[in-house]
A protein has these predicted regions:
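Hydrophobic pocket/interface hotspot
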Residues: 47, 58-59, 66, 78, ...
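Bacterial Sec-dependent N-terminal signal peptides
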Residues: 1-27
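Sec/Tat-exported extracytoplasmic proteins
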Residues: 44-47, 51-55, 65-66, 86-93, ...
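Surface-exposed, charged secondary-structure patches
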Residues: 85-124
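A short gly/proline-enriched turn/hairpin at secondary-structure junctions
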Residues: 61, 67-77, 88-95
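Residue-level signal for glycine
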Residues: 126-128
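Short, low-complexity N-terminal intrinsically disordered segments enriched in polar/charged residues
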Residues: 20-61, 159
């Protein structure tokens, strides 16, 4: 009888320890995810400011191995590809400003998270040029959270 009580006590203690560990990981994961969300919001807040100035440092918001996967175009990868994307959008696309709205951020905040959202882009006269949705895979790097894979699609019907 003593052995079975001892065994039950050990099982109960192991279970309590397991639950406590799981809760600790959940709390830590939430803190990491919140950290990622704050970094993403900060990056999003300055993206179009840099773009509006045609500032090449916009590439620093992206991981060195980032890819922008625009619709109907090959992926543009690396900082050189990201720079080309923004240069072309500014010089030939007529885009002068934009706005993003984050709908959700998914993940545990440890290495990668995914941002889901909506975008709008405007010309120099503040006329809406395009609007759509996006998914961005963010990567935690030694320099903080960086845009790693950026994919978007227009809500407008292609002509």
């Amino acid at each position: 009888m003593k052995k079975s009580k001892k065994f039950l006590l050990m099982v109960a203690l192991a279970f309590v320890q397991f639950i406590a560990h799981a809760q600790s990981n959940k709390t830590n994961g939430n803190a990491l995810l919140e950290e990622a969300k704050k970094a993403i919001a900060k990056s999003n807040a300055i993206l179009f400011d840099l773009y509006l100035k045609n500032d090449g440092s916009v590439v620093k918001l992206f991981a060195e191995d980032a890819c922008i996967m625009a619709p109907n175009a090959p992926a543009l990868c690396g900082r050189e590809g990201v720079a080309k994307f923004f240069k072309d959008a500014y010089e030939t696309g007529g885009v002068r400003s934009g706005k993003t709205t984050t709908l959700n951020v998914y993940g545990d905040g440890q290495e990668f998270v995914t941002e889901e959202g909506l975008y709008q882009v405007f010309d120099a006269n503040k006329k809406l040029v395009d609007e759509g949705k996006f998914l961005i895979l963010w990567k935690k790097t030694k320099d903080g959270w960086k845009d790693f894979r950026d994919s978007f699609s227009s809500n407008r019907i292609q002509k």
